[in-house]
């Protein structure tokens, strides 16, 4: 591996931060630079320009080495998430340049312009880390794993602040559940934490261990007046010293009286009055008109049915009358013809 790769690494370190370049601590960045030197440069930059390019790289390295550092702006450490974010951004832009197949002086210009922009981008990542993620605990002792950019080593850093994280006043009604929460927002991100221990503190400066374990809350069901008083929560660490201490002052309030709601089937006087008043309200004109139309429709239907029934009944009576009249005349004539015959028969016999 020639001196070109070493100078590229130095240029990258200088361009990305005004100190030792943290992104060079990422193995994927080192592999990408090796590929750039061995695979891309030979076919995209004439040999006669290699020397001039490397002189510019060397000058860039010197310029960044001479920058004065502001300790408040950059502390030379980052966490794993910040390093990964900066490395991914750099590799993405480097791949964009190599995929474009740019050559010659244009390649050199784009490479150094990309390094300049990546320096600004990574600086914003570092500033955000130092403001939001570096030692975020406002109290207690947090153990945070950091990466030292000077030697790319990971070490556990102790963010030491006051052990005392204050006192909390808790009010709970009698016969309700008491819940004491000892967890702080940075506990999950800290390393080297052990168990939560809850103590009952008595007036004679003595205390009794109530519970110990991984649970960050202490729950006591159906508290009584005897549960009022002082409690203390202590979170342990691997350093044999507490990470946080929180004090609780518990006040047990009188038992809450719950109002009994009446059954839905029982009508109270107020409800009866309301219902009666609602029933006595006059109907709206639209409802009155609809009810009248419905009544007229029903009456008309009944009258029509009655008329049809009566007409059918009358028709049947007329038909029966006609039939009876016709049959009645025929039987009378037959009787008249039969009488003379009988008389004739009698006269013959005589």
UniProtKB/Swiss-Prot annotation:
GO cellular component: acrosomal membrane; acrosomal vesicle; endoplasmic reticulum membrane; membrane; plasma membrane; protein complex involved in cell-cell adhesion
Subcellular location: Cell membrane; Cytoplasmic vesicle, Secretory vesicle, Acrosome membrane
Glycosylation sites: 204
Keywords: Cell membrane, Cytoplasmic vesicle, Disulfide bond, Fertilization, Glycoprotein, Immunoglobulin domain, Membrane, Phosphoprotein, Signal, Transmembrane, Transmembrane helix
Residue positions, PTM Phosphoserine: 325
Classification via Pfam families: IZUMO, Izumo-Ig
Cytoplasmic side stretches: 314-350
Region (Important for interaction with IZUMO1R), start-end ranges: 148-160
Signal peptide as annotated in the record: 1-21
Tissue occurrence: Sperm-specific (at protein level). Detectable on sperm surface only after the acrosome reaction.
Extracellular membrane side: 22-292
Membrane topology recorded in Swiss-Prot or TrEMBL: Single-pass type I membrane protein
Annotated Ig-like C2-type domain residues: 167-251
Post-translational modification: N-glycosylated. Glycosylation is not essential for fusion and for proper protein trafficking in sperm.
Complexes and interactors: Monomer, homodimer; disulfide-linked and homooligomer; depending on the context. Interacts with IZUMO1R/JUNO. IZUMO1 and IZUMO1R/JUNO form a complex with 1:1 stoichiometry. In gamete recognition, IZUMO1R/JUNO first binds to monomeric IZUMO1. The weak, but specific interaction with IZUMO1R/JUNO induces IZUMO1 homodimerization. The process follows a tight binding phase where IZUMO1 bends the entire structure towards the sperm membrane side through a thiol-disulfide exchange reaction. The molecule no longer binds to IZUMO1R/JUNO and instead binds to a putative second oocyte receptor.
UniProt remark on domains: The extracellular domain assumes a distinct boomerang shape when not bound to IZUMO1R/JUNO. Interaction with IZUMO1R/JUNO triggers a conformation change, so that the IZUMO1 extracellular domain assumes an upright conformation.
Protein name: Izumo sperm-egg fusion protein 1
Organism encoding this protein: Homo sapiens (Human)
